[in-house]
């Protein structure tokens, strides 16, 4: 037997109209408990659920009480009794428990206990019974065993005494004989008459909790009277249990209906919002479809432009090739011109050499003319003609020398110009070669551009196809969203009707709760 500690012997009280409800499986594991039971026990719902019910057992309750309870329940009958339960902190509270088996398809699947607050007198009787059982005394005192029998035979004894008094009054043997003969049948008839109605009641009492042990907790009566009184109390507890469960169910139903009503209103509001947002999505999808179509058109235009760019790139490659060829020809021409200028410079050098020879001859002629003039002067008149010729020759030699000097300057200038031309031609040749290299690089770049444009053209074609497909999908989505919007509107109407039904259900549950509350008092 489980011994839960500690205990404080401090009683917790609760309102008389409060009902404490629990259900267990066949092993006594708690499967349900209402809020009132949780509050008075001090345990949390998590601590109680799936825990053994003897978690709240108080050590002051004798094991015989629980043994009697389980024997009664396993026999398929309800059990009723005053029980002292322990709180989590060691306090206690008294209950008048009515425990019934729970059936499912004819088989017992668990037990249900509905507890109400007992009276102070019932608690005192239960404590007295606990003390007797705890002391090892019999549950039913000996006097309670023979006193009911005496009370049953009391009418027969009284009638016998009346017959005896009649005999004394007649003052004869015939009077005593007559009194004896009348007393026996009258007493037996009275006893049978008394037992006849009582037996019918006792047969009804057998269907309820009428055990003498339990009766001691609820009444001071003895024998059949105690059993009948206990049967009435049991029926009252059974009715209260039924009403309490109806009330508990009505409370749960009311709460569920209230939650369903709230959810229905929220669902209706959500569906209305969904419908509005679906319309916005439909509008957005329409705009997206139009935009997609426009994108498809723009992509097609881009594809056309890309194709033209590809053609222009091809043409640019052709022009680059022609430019490269022209520059190469120009480079060759510059090279040839440079060679000609170089030859001209060489010829100028040769002319310079000839001019130097002529200059030397002129100088020599001038010297000879000077010598001739000297000789003519010596000859006098005979050499005057020769002197004139010598002067002319000297003059011619001087002019030749001057011309030769001019030619020499011109040839030097021509050589400088030719050298500059050669340098310029060499620079032009280098630049032409660099230009050819740049044209080759441009041609390579144009090849890359042409390949990129080809890839862009291919991707643009794919994008155009995807845009067309996306446009078709957008139209399909638009149709689906329109269908969803229609269904959402229909569902919203149904949600409103559901909300209205939930309100009516809440009203009905509240009416049921009020009806049960009127009778469960």
From Swiss-Prot:
Name assigned to this protein: Methyl-accepting chemotaxis protein Aer
Subcellular location: Cell inner membrane
CDD domains in the cross-refs: MCP_signal, PAS
Induction notes from the record: Expression is regulated by the transcriptional regulatory protein of anaerobic gene expression, ANR. Both ANR box1 and box2 are required for the functioning of the aer promoter.
MF terms (GO), sorted A to Z: transmembrane signaling receptor activity
UniProt xrefs under InterPro entries: Chemotax_Me-accpt_rcpt, MCPsignal_dom, PAS, PAS-like_dom_sf, PAS_fold_3, T_SNARE_dom
Entries under Pfam families matching the protein: MCPsignal, PAS_3
Gene deletion effect: Mutant shows decreased aerotaxis. Aerotaxis is abolished in the aer-mcpB double mutant.
Organism: Pseudomonas aeruginosa (strain ATCC 15692 / DSM 22644 / CIP 104116 / JCM 14847 / LMG 12228 / 1C / PRS 101 / PAO1)
Residue intervals of the PAS domain: 21-76
Segments forming domain Methyl-accepting transducer: 249-485
Biological function: Chemotactic transducer for aerotaxis.
Gene: aer
Domain of life where this protein originates: Bacteria
Keywords: Cell inner membrane, Cell membrane, Chemotaxis, Membrane, Methylation, Receptor, Transducer, Transmembrane, Transmembrane helix
Protein family: Belongs to the methyl-accepting chemotaxis (MCP) protein family.
PROSITE patterns in the record: CHEMOTAXIS_TRANSDUC_2 (PS50111), PAS (PS50112)
């Amino acid at each position: 037997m489980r011994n839960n500690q500690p205990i404080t012997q401090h009683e917790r009280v609760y309102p008389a109209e409060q009902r404490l409800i629990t259900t267990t499986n066949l092993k006594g594991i708690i499967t349900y408990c209402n809020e009132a039971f949780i509050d008075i026990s001090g345990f949390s719902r998590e601590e109680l659920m799936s825990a053994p019910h003897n978690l709240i057992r108080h050590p002051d309750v004798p094991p015989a009480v629980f043994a009697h309870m389980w024997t009664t329940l396993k026999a398929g009958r309800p059990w009723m009794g005053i029980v002292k339960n322990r709180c989590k902190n060691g306090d206690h509270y008294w209950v008048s428990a009515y425990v019934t088996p729970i059936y499912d398809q004819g088989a017992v699947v668990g037990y249900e206990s509905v507890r109400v607050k007992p009276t102070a007198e019932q608690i005192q009787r239960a404590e007295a019974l606990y003390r007797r059982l705890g002391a090892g005394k019999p549950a039913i005192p000996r006097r309670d065993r023979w006193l009911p029998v005496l009370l049953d035979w009391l009418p027969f004894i009284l009638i016998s005494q009346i017959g005896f008094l009649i005999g004394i009054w007649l003052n004869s043997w015939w009077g005593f004989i007559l009194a004896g003969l009348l007393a026996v049948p009258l007493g037996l008839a009275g006893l049978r008459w008394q037992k006849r109605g009582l037996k019918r009641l006792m047969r009804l009492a057998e269907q309820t909790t009428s055990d003498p042990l339990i009766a001691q907790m609820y009444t001071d009566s003895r024998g059949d009277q105690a059993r009948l009184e206990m049967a009435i109390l049991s029926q009252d507890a059974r009715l209260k249990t039924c009403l309490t469960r109806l009330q508990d169910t009505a409370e749960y139903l009311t709460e569920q209906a209230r939650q369903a009503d709230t959810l229905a209103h929220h669902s209706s509001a959500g569906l209305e919002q969904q419908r509005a947002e679906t319309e916005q999505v439909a509008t957005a999808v329409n705009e997206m479809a139009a935009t997609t179509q426009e994108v498809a058109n723009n992509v097609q235009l881009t594809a056309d432009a890309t194709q033209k760019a590809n053609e222009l790139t091809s043409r640019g490659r052709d022009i680059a090739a022609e430019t490269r060829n022209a520059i190469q020809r120009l480079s060759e021409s510059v090279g040839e011109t440079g060679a000609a200028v170089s030859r001209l410079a060489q010829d100028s050098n040769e002319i310079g050499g000839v001019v130097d020879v002529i200059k030397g001859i002129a100088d020599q002629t001038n010297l000879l003319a000077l010598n001739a003039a000297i000789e003519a002067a010596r000859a006098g008149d005979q050499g005057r003609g020769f002197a004139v010729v010598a002067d002319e020759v000297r003059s011619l030699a001087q002019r030749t020398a001057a011309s030769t000097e001019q030619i020499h300057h011109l040839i030097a200038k021509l050589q400088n110009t030719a050298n500059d031309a050669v340098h310029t031609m060499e620079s032009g040749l280098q630049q032409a070669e660099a230009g050819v290299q740049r044209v080759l690089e441009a041609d390579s770049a144009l090849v890359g551009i042409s390949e990129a444009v080809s890839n862009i053209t291919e991707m643009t074609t794919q994008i155009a196809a995807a845009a067309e497909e996306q446009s078709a999908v957008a139209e399909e989505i638009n149709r689906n969203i329109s269908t969803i919007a229609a269904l959402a509107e229909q569902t919203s109407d149904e949600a409103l009707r559901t909300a209205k039904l939930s309100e009516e259900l809440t009203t009905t549950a509240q009416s049921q709760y009020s009806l049960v509350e009127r009778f469960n008092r």
